[in-house]
């Protein structure tokens, strides 16, 4: 929640928006004093803050706050679509918090979903990567290490190649979509 003041709040915010100099939480999160570099401070509500900050900054701050709670005590952090509103480098920063002993002394675990398999290339171990693969009307969980033995394979390329069947759209379906769109936008209709 944006209403949490904590040590290092400004440092976290600057990772996601380098133009932020300071954010102070007031009145139990009902008001905020926001200062951008080289500007006068402004006092705004939480709603106003969300309108002034980018969705990536708001999402990043919330993600880091939740991560810090889990990293302090151990446990699990579940994040659906970890890349939402964040660029890949910033997602990698969050992934690194869980991979390093210095920031994860209690062995906390990050479990995330993503539509961007390139993020998986940043995960060094292959025994903790799972794919959700389509199977008929349902899905199945496939452990990457059980299907791919070679360590030099990029996880994103394995995913995109549909080596693990059901992880990528079928070629015939993609071709049919392109043909449909071409027909619909054609001047000859």
Task: Give the ranges of each region predicted by the language model.
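Walker B catalytic acidic pair
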Residues: 80-82
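A short linear-motif detector with a strong N-terminal bias
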Residues: 2-4, 55-58, 89-92, 108-112
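Hydrophobic "anchor" residues on beta-strands that sit immediately upstream
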Residues: 76-77
């Amino acid at each position: 929640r944006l209403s949490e003041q904590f040590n290092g709040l400004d440092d976290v915010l600057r990772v996601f928006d380098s133009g932020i100099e300071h954010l102070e939480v007031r009145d139990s999160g009902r008001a905020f004093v926001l200062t951008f570099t080289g500007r006068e401070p402004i006092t705004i509500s939480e709603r106003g803050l969300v309108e002034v900050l980018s969705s990536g900054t708001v999402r990043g701050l919330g993600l880091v706050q939740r991560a810090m709670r889990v990293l302090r005590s151990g446990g699990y952090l579940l994040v659906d679509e970890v890349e939402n509103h964040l660029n890949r480098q910033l997602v990698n920063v969050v992934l690194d918090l869980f991979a390093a002993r210095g920031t994860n002394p209690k062995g906390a675990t990050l479990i995330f979903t993503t539509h961007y398999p390139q993020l998986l290339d940043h995960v060094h171990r292959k025994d903790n990567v799972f794919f959700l693969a389509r199977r008929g009307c349902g899905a199945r969980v496939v452990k990457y290490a059980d299907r791919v033995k070679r360590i030099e394979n990029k996880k994103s390329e394995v995913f995109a190649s549909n080596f693990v069947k059901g992880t990528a759209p079928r070629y015939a379906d993609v071709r049919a979509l392109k043909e449909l769109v071409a027909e619909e936008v054609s001047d000859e209709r």
